[in-house]
């Protein structure tokens, strides 16, 4: 049996539950801690958005990830980080198509947001 890197198109909450993902920055000279997202019990979602920690209730519907009831810390960071963080959180709130493979999660917003699996976090 041959297996590729992309999903078969079937992504649901059970596929992502108990997993942790870290944003793979295009710019390797990033000065800030990378964005992280975790999917927990009852599909609660939490993570770090670049400047602030966030949490909310996740749902996967028709191949899109939605996060509602988002709460977050309120630190003020540099304008570029704040803009990147806000774009990420807005994308989660309005819903974003996603692709999933064993070690990669891609959020297909205005641009592709690539995340790699953080191994050992929930093992």
Model regions and ranges:
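Lipid interaction determinants
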Residues: 5-123
């Amino acid at each position: 049996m041959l297996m590729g890197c992309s999903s078969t198109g079937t992504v649901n909450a059970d596929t992502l539950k108990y997993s942790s993902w870290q944003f793979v920055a295009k710019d390797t000279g990033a000065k800030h801690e990378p964005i992280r997202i975790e999917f927990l019990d009852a599909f609660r979602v939490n993570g770090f958005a670049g400047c602030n920690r966030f949490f909310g209730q996740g749902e996967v519907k028709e191949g899109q990830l939605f996060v509602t009831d988002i709460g977050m810390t309120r630190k003020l960071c540099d304008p570029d980080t704040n803009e990147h963080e806000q774009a990420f959180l807005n994308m989660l709130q309005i819903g974003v198509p996603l692709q999933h493979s064993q070690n990669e999660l891609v959020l297909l917003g205005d641009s592709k947001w690539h995340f790699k699996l953080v191994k050992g976090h929930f093992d």
